[in-house]
Design a protein with these regions (language model features):
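Acidic donor-binding segment of Leloir-type glycosyltransferases
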Residues: 22-69
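Glycine-rich, basic loop-to-helix element that forms the pyrophosphate-binding segment
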Residues: 66-88
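Short aromatic/hydrophobic "clamp" motif used to bind/position activated sugar donors
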Residues: 93
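Conserved donor NDP-sugar-binding/catalytic core segment of glycosyltransferases
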Residues: 101, 105-138
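Conserved nucleotide-sugar donor-binding catalytic segment
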Residues: 125, 146-227
Length: 433
């Protein structure tokens, strides 16, 4: 009798592709399988797509109902896999994601090798990677080739390209008290951490043919993760996989409507798409809504404001208004007239006043506007709390900031400001030590 294969599909908010992933299992030439769809509390559209397939008795569905505020605390797909493995009954186990499909001969080919070679516990195949644009058009593709027998598979093999025995995963559990390591440090390479565990017992044997296809959408975690700094600067507009927009204000995320974006002269093209775990690690603050005109302390920081009948222009930071001394200073910091928010005089009057923002070159240690990008030779800095935080150029571009708008700062002035923690992206090594 053909052995049972257990497939674990992890799903989160990909209604346009999760159905294709499920159908790729249904269309397998090898028919003795069970599919566990582990959904991470996806949106309604995704869940409705999944529900269409649940009449099939071989398909099982579980929803995590995870709270958004808890989402960042573990590597969610690893957590879901750990919950699924004890539910499975197959002799062999493999994995699938909602942006990946199996080719029809995938299970048949892998089972054949594992059944023929009793000394082999893990097999892996080649994978076709299709990189897609926002309108789902292919802009590039590559093939991840097999590279012989892998004694160190971490970072070299995608988890949708693997099948392993139940026997070896039980060995992992005996040693570690669990299966996949779902520590949040492994968001980008959870499979690599698990492969390291598997490699302690057995190597990965290659099947040198393409057996699965993965799509790299603009909203794929790996693409959204790239060049996002560990700390997102205050004043940044962000969104996750949903269409809701937030402004990072004093390291909280504040929901803001498209109407209020226009009212406060934010620009939607400046919104930075980030992975949901990065978004939800920021506590949600008060929404940016009409109440800001009643309670001006709720106006987001890093806005230019002025009263309707006053010539004075102010910059908001730390919930105080800093008067910009004159037009020369306004231009020196590359402020723009179109960014000024016109408010009733009584609202402006209620905001506490602090120092002036004066000529950068005439007063060492002068108050710097928060969130201003500075350049000194080839180095870039963002200012916060009168400290200069180094920032990588790739991070600048990722945050939709403009290097062309950077304010030049002479070395003689730079030396008068202390340095803060850098805004940098540290690429997680795909090789787990």
């Amino acid at each position: 009798m053909n052995p049972l294969v257990s497939i674990i599909l992890t799903s989160y908010n990909k209604p346009n592709s999760v159905g294709k992933a499920i159908e790729s299992v249904i269309n397998q030439l090898y028919t003795h399988w069970e599919l566990f769809i582990m959904d991470d509390n996806s949106n309604t559209e995704t869940v409705q797509t999944i529900m269409k397939y649940l009449k099939n008795p071989k398909i099982h569905y579980f929803n995590s109902h995870i709270e958004e505020s808890e989402r960042y605390k573990t590597t969610r797909y690893a957590t879901l896999i750990n919950k699924a493995i004890p539910k499975t009954k197959g002799k062999y186990i493999c994995y699938l994601t909602d942006d990946n499909i199996y080719l029809p001969n995938r299970l048949k080919t892998m089972v054949h090798l594992l059944e023929r070679r009793k000394d082999v516990d893990i097999v892996y195949s080649e994978q076709l990677v299709k990189i897609l644009s926002n309108n789902r058009k292919k802009i590039n593709q590559i093939v991840r080739k097999t590279q012989g027998i892998q004694y160190k598979a971490a970072g070299r093999v995608d988890h949708c390209s693997v099948m392993h025995t139940r026997k070896i995963v039980n060995e992992v559990y005996k040693k570690y008290g669990g299966y996949w390591n779902d520590d949040p440090q492994f968001w980008i390479n959870g499979d690599a951490a698990f492969w390291k565990r598997l490699n302690e017992f057995k190597p990965f044997y290659p099947i040198p043919q393409i057996l699965d296809v993965t799509w790299k959408f603009p909203e794929s975690f790996q693409r959204l993760y790239t060049n996002v700094p560990k700390t997102i600067p205050n004043g940044t507009l962000v969104r996750g996989l949903s269409n809701e927009i937030f402004v990072i204000d004093q390291q909280t995320r504040r929901r803001i409507s498209k109407k209020m974006l226009g009212t406060l002269n934010y620009y939607e093209e400046r919104v930075v798409k980030i992975p949901d775990p990065f978004l939800f690690k920021y506590e949600e603050g008060e929404p940016v809504d009409e109440e800001i005109f009643t309670y001006p302390e709720k106006i987001p920081n890093q806005r230019l404001i002025k009263g309707k009948n006053s010539p004075n222009i102010y910059y908001l930071q730390n919930h105080k208004k800093y008067r910009i001394k004159n037009l020369h200073v306004f231009k020196q910091y590359h402020f723009k007239q179109n960014d000024i928010v016109i408010l009733d005089e009584e609202i402006v009057a209620k905001i506490p006043e602090s120092n002036q923002i004066i000529d950068l070159l005439t007063n060492t240690g002068a108050t710097l506007p928060d969130g201003t990008l500075f350049k000194c030779y080839s180095n870039y800095y963002l200012s916060y709390h009168n400290r200069l935080h180094p920032i990588q150029k790739d991070v600048i571009n990722r945050l939709n900031l403009s290097v062309q708008q950077a304010v030049n700062m002479p070395t003689s002035i730079l030396s008068h400001y202390s340095k803060g923690e850098p805004f940098k992206w540290v690429k997680k090594s795909m090789y787990v030590k």
